[in-house]
Amino acid sequence: MAIMRKTHPLLKIINHSFIDLPTPCNISSWWNFGSLLGICLIIQILTGLFLAMHYTSDTATAFSSVTHICRDVNYGWLIRYLHANGASMFFICLFIHVGRGIYYGSYMLSETWNIGIVLLLTTMATAFVGYVLPWGQMSFWGATVITNLLSAIPYIGTTLVEWIWGGFSVDKATLTRFFAFHFILPFIITAFVLVHLLFLHETGSGNPSGLNSDSDKIPFHPYYTIKDLLGVILLLMVLMILVLFFPDVLGDPDNYTPANPLNTPAHIKPEWYFLFAYAILRSXPNKLGGVLALILSILVLATFPLLNSSKQHGLVYRPITQALYWIFIANLLILTWIGGQPVEYPFTTVGQVASXLYFAIIVILMPIANMIENDILKL
C-alpha cells in the first residue's frame, strides 16, 4: 500500500517541501534563517490578528486603543510587544538571510533571488505602514516625512502625495488606509513566500562549499526538521527575553506621546531596521536624488547575479571579495548608526562617504575583485 503523504494531493505538496525534500548534507546554521522567517511571519500574522480585534483606526481613538490593549485586554501587553519586537526579529533574520545569500552566492538562483527582493520590499512597506498605526509622535511625523518624499517625483508628485494621504495632510483617511494596507500585505507576503519556495525547490538549495551537491543529498526530515526546531527555540528565547525584560529597548520614547501635528519631535527617525536606508536617503542633498538613492539601496541587490563574473560559487575561496564583503557589512552598521544621529557635522560627511561606499562595493569593487580572482586562478 502506498504511503498517504506521497499520494494525497495536499499532503504530497507538504511532503515534497518539508519531508522528502532532497537537501545538501552539509548546509550550515546560516541556512536556518529561511525557516525562522516563516516562523516570524506566522507570529506576526497571529499577534496582528488579535491586535486588530481591539484596535481602532481612527485618529481620535487609535492611541487610546493601543493603551487599552496594553492595560485592559488579557495579555494584551504581551501580544502588543510580541508584535512590535517580532518585527525586529523578522528584520534581523531577513538581513542575515540576505547576507548569507550574498556570501554563499545564492543570488545565482536568480528567480528565487528576485522574488526575495520583492519580499524584502513588501516587508519593508508593511513595517512602515504598521509603525504609523499606534498614532504616536514618531508614527505621525515618520508617516509625514516619508510619504512627503513622493512629492519629489516630477509633474505628478504633489498629486500623488495628496492621493496617498486622502487629503492635504496625514490625517484620519491616511490612518484608515494604512491599517487596511497593514492588514492585507502580510497575506500577500505569504503568497510571495510560496512562490519563493516554489522557485527554490526547482533548483534545490546551495551549500557552503559552493560545489554541486546533487550526488550527496539527504531527506529534509528528520535531520533538518530537528535542526530548524533548535533555531526556532533559540529565536523564541531571544524574542521572549526582549519582550519580557526589554520591551521598549528598540522603540522610540516619542511614540508614547500622542500624535500632535503642531509639535515636531527634535529628531525624526524610523525604526532601527530602516536606519541604513534613511542614512542613504539623507546623504543626497537633492530631494529627488535622495529618493532615488533610497529605492536603489534595495534594488541594487538585483545587480548581484548580473555583475557576477566569478568562476566560483560563493566567497569561501575568494579572499579579495570576502574582505570586501566584511567591509560592506561594517559599512552597513555605520550607516545604521548614522541614520539615528542628528543632521550635523561630522555625521553628514560620514553618512555621505558610507553611502557612496555602499554602492561602490556592490557595483564597482566586487566585479573588479571577481576579475582579479579569475586571473589568479589561471596562474
Swiss-Prot record:
Sequence positions that bind a ubiquinone: H201
Localization per record: Mitochondrion inner membrane
Keyword Iron: yes
Record's GO cellular component terms: mitochondrial inner membrane; respiratory chain complex III
GO MF entries: metal ion binding; ubiquinol-cytochrome-c reductase activity
Sequence positions that bind heme b b566: H97, H196
List of residues binding heme b b562: H83, H182
Topology in membrane: Multi-pass membrane protein
InterPro entries in the record: Cyt_b/b6_C (IPR005798), Cyt_b/b6_C_sf (IPR036150), Cyt_b/b6_N (IPR005797), Cytb/b6-like_sf (IPR027387), Cytochrome_b (IPR030689), Cytochrome_b_C_euk/bac (IPR048260), Cytochrome_b_N_euk/bac (IPR048259), Di-haem_cyt_TM (IPR016174)
Keywords assigned: Electron transport, Heme, Iron, Membrane, Metal-binding, Mitochondrion, Mitochondrion inner membrane, Respiratory chain, Transmembrane, Transmembrane helix, Transport, Ubiquinone
Pfam families named in the record: Cytochrom_B_C, Cytochrome_B
Membrane-spanning segments: 33-53, 77-98, 113-133, 178-198, 226-246, 288-308, 320-340, 347-367
Cofactor(s) it depends on: heme b
Cofactor note: Binds 2 heme b groups non-covalently.
Superkingdom of this protein's organism: Eukaryota
Biological process annotations from GO: mitochondrial electron transport, ubiquinol to cytochrome c
The protein's role, per its UniProt record: Component of the ubiquinol-cytochrome c reductase complex (complex III or cytochrome b-c1 complex) that is part of the mitochondrial respiratory chain. The b-c1 complex mediates electron transfer from ubiquinol to cytochrome c. Contributes to the generation of a proton gradient across the mitochondrial membrane that is then used for ATP synthesis.
Similarity section: Belongs to the cytochrome b family.
Assembly: The cytochrome bc1 complex contains 11 subunits: 3 respiratory subunits (MT-CYB, CYC1 and UQCRFS1), 2 core proteins (UQCRC1 and UQCRC2) and 6 low-molecular weight proteins (UQCRH/QCR6, UQCRB/QCR7, UQCRQ/QCR8, UQCR10/QCR9, UQCR11/QCR10 and a cleavage product of UQCRFS1). This cytochrome bc1 complex then forms a dimer.
Note: Heme 1 (or BL or b562) is low-potential and absorbs at about 562 nm, and heme 2 (or BH or b566) is high-potential and absorbs at about 566 nm.
Protein name: Cytochrome b
Species of origin: Abrothrix jelskii
Gene designation: MT-CYB
